[in-house]
């Protein structure tokens, strides 16, 4: 029997990509999806490339929780905590693609994301979801914080060289640049092509996560 997976925030960039990945997953099936902006609309009306999912309609969050074994949240930072509590209380697994559960320290979370922990005990249940390093810790857990892009690509690229003794762990520099899909679909001047083309913008928020998770020792 396949795992029933629901997606909250399925019409954002991350959510839409998750739809694509889960439709091809041999052990999972999408049970329900939700979208605040497109509730009641077909996903294929939002993304014509998903015409093969013509009968998949965006519902509300409660429907996703009710119909699913595991709920993925592809929401902006700060919007996953209440939903996570609801899912855990209902005995469902919850995987957050945002940053709400990535940092163990509330002080650091407030510093970088401007929010607070709504339930500290809930945060204590969260496990960092990078299976290449933490597979044993993730097994059986109900609340998983999906790692961000920098904390995924950098350690996974470096680890084979370190494990095989090809490089020293001292003096490693990760020179990273990212695109703007992580900023979401909502248009704004900062994400407008003429503002971004051939330019770089310093984003210190990405420092918080890699420096708080010792992935390689």
Q: What annotation goes with each model-predicted range?
A:
Residues 1-203:
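N-terminal Rossmann-like NAD(P) cofactor-binding subdomain of oxidoreductases
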């Amino acid at each position: 029997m396949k795992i029933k997976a629901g997606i909250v925030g399925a019409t954002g960039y991350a959510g839409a990509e998750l739809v694509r990945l889960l439709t091809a997953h041999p052990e999972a099936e999408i049970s329900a999806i939700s979208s605040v902006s497109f509730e009641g609309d077909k996903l294929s009306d939002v993304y014509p490339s998903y015409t093969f999912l013509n009968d998949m309609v965006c519902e509300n969050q409660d429907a996703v929780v009710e119909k699913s074994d595991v709920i993925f949240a592809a929401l902006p930072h700060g919007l996953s905590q209440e939903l996570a509590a609801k899912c855990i209380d209902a005995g469902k697994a919850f995987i957050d693609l945002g940053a709400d559960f990535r940092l163990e320290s509330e002080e650091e979370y407030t510093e970088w994301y401007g929010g607070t922990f709504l339930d500290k005990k809930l945060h204590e249940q969260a496990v960092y979801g990078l299976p290449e390093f933490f597979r044993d810790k993730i097994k059986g857990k109900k609340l998983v914080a999906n790692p961000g892009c920098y904390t995924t690509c950098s350690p996974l690229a470096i680890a084979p060289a370190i494990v095989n003794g090809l490089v020293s762990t001292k003096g490693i520099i990760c020179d990273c640049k990212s695109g703007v899909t992580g900023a979401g679909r909502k248009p704004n001047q900062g994400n407008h092509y003429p503002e971004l083309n051939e330019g770089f913008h310093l984003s210190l928020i990405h420092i918080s996560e890699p420096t708080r998770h010792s992935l390689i020792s």
